[in-house]
């Protein structure tokens, strides 16, 4: 496991974004862990998160010209990732959408730089894939090309069929999806963290029941 992925998991635990216990997912499954990126909710944690996104994006090798953040969580994530990339010497434009169109000021649903070239979508997780699908439609309608999707965590679990939500997005839209960390990374972290050993069997069992191959 790359050091930055291990660092990200530790960071998420420290911020209580990642928790262990018994949780019910949207799909009604009993999960031994819970990830809530909305708890990266202060300046310093958002700055650190943005640097993890930038590292993951650069390591992925995905070619892109700009960033797009789907409303609402993706808005701050795209802006922050753009700042972190600039900090590392890669300055790219970013844009985001509104849920409701404005009929005054700049109008419309899109805000920020014009959508041009290859556009990388930034979001926290992929659940049903609705946000990505809407983003792809917006990007293509503007005459630009979706380049891929960058997320914080890939749970690597099946949706309604045999594929995970991430795999479904990759297959349906022909896009690469890069995650800062995955369930596989989380298991590796637990295996090397004696203080968290009590949670390892539950996470392994969850992956055995609902997991997909990477």
From Swiss-Prot:
Q: Give the matching Gene3D superfamilies.
A: 3.40.50.2020
Q: What GO molecular functions are on record for this protein?
A: magnesium ion binding; orotate phosphoribosyltransferase activity
Would you say which domain of life the source belongs to? Bacteria
- Which pathway does this chain act in? Pyrimidine metabolism; UMP biosynthesis via de novo pathway; UMP from orotate: step 1/2
Q: Which reaction is catalysed here?
A: orotidine 5'-phosphate + diphosphate = orotate + 5-phospho-alpha-D-ribose 1-diphosphate
Annotated keywords: Glycosyltransferase, Magnesium, Pyrimidine biosynthesis, Transferase
Q: Which parts of the sequence bind orotate?
A: 34-35, 127, 155
Per the similarity annotation, which family is this?
A: Belongs to the purine/pyrimidine phosphoribosyltransferase family. PyrE subfamily.
The entry describes its oligomerization and partners as: Homodimer.
- How is this protein named in the record? Orotate phosphoribosyltransferase
Q: Which organism is it from?
A: Chromobacterium violaceum (strain ATCC 12472 / DSM 30191 / JCM 1249 / CCUG 213 / NBRC 12614 / NCIMB 9131 / NCTC 9757 / MK)
State the gene name recorded for this protein.
Answer: pyrE
């Amino acid at each position: 496991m790359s050091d930055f992925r291990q660092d990200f998991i530790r960071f998420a635990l420290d911020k209580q974004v990642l928790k262990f216990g018994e949780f019910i997912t949207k799909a009604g499954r009993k999960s031994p862990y819970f990830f809530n990126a909305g708890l990266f909710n202060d300046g310093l944690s958002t700055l650190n998160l943005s640097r993890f996104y930038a590292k993951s994006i650069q390591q992925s090798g995905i070619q892109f010209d700009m960033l797009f953040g789907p409303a609402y969580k993706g808005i701050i994530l795209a802006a922050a990732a753009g700042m972190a990339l600039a900090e590392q010497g890669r300055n790219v434009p970013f844009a985001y959408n509104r849920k409701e169109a404005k009929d005054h000021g700049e109008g419309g649903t899109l805000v920020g730089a014009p959508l041009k070239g290859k556009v990388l979508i930034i979001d926290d997780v992929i659940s049903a894939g609705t946000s990505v699908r809407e983003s792809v439609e917006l990007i293509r309608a503007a005459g630009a090309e979706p380049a891929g999707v960058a997320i914080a965590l890939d749970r690597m679990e099946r949706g309604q069929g045999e594929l995970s939500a991430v795999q479904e997005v990759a297959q349906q839209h022909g896009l690469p999806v890069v995650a800062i960390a995955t369930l596989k990374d989380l298991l590796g972290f637990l295996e090397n963290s004696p203080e968290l050993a009590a949670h390892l069997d539950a996470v392994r069992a969850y992956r055995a029941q609902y997991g997909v191959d990477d």
